[in-house]
Amino acid sequence: FNHIPSGEKFDIGADLFPKLVENNLPFYALPMDFEWVDIGKVPDYWSAIRSVLQGKVRQVDIPGKEVKPGVYTGLNVAVNWDKVNITGPVYIGGMSRIEDGATIIGPSMIGPSCCICEGATIDNSIIFDYSKIGKGVRLVDKLVFGRYCVGKNGDHFDLQEASLDWLITDSRRMDLSEPSPQQKAMAELLGSDLINIPD
């Protein structure tokens, strides 16, 4: 396209559209019956997920089946509803496991094939596919994606580099060993809230 320069940052909405109008080139719009939600940055993504869970985005429904008021699940979610504390709006992806004693406070989204271990707390957080949140871990206002933990403002850290990958890891890993004596000592020091993941 000859109006987009190569080799430099160029935004369609901020650069191209104004350039077309400025040069009196054809530029058309069409009314559409949907709501545009921009997710260019982490805070935007965070806001979009919250808005969907709270029913604020027109023509977008929470996927899955509503199993309790404000709590939606995909297929084959393993949970004993009498032994967990879940306050919606919450979405739990298919094939996920929520262990007894876990707490999930919405708006929160847990992707497919996740494991939220006993005593873990997920509060206003987004957990991506195949994440395992260890016993007693408390996540508030966090986004967990692979080996990264991201705050809602975009600040992040690498769980492996921070040596916290024994608390939050890939649910598909089979090589998990018993926590080291140092890790057990840290858990005892921190008490029932095993760890608050830092901002």
How would you label these PLM feature ranges?
Residues 6-199:
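Left-handed beta-helix
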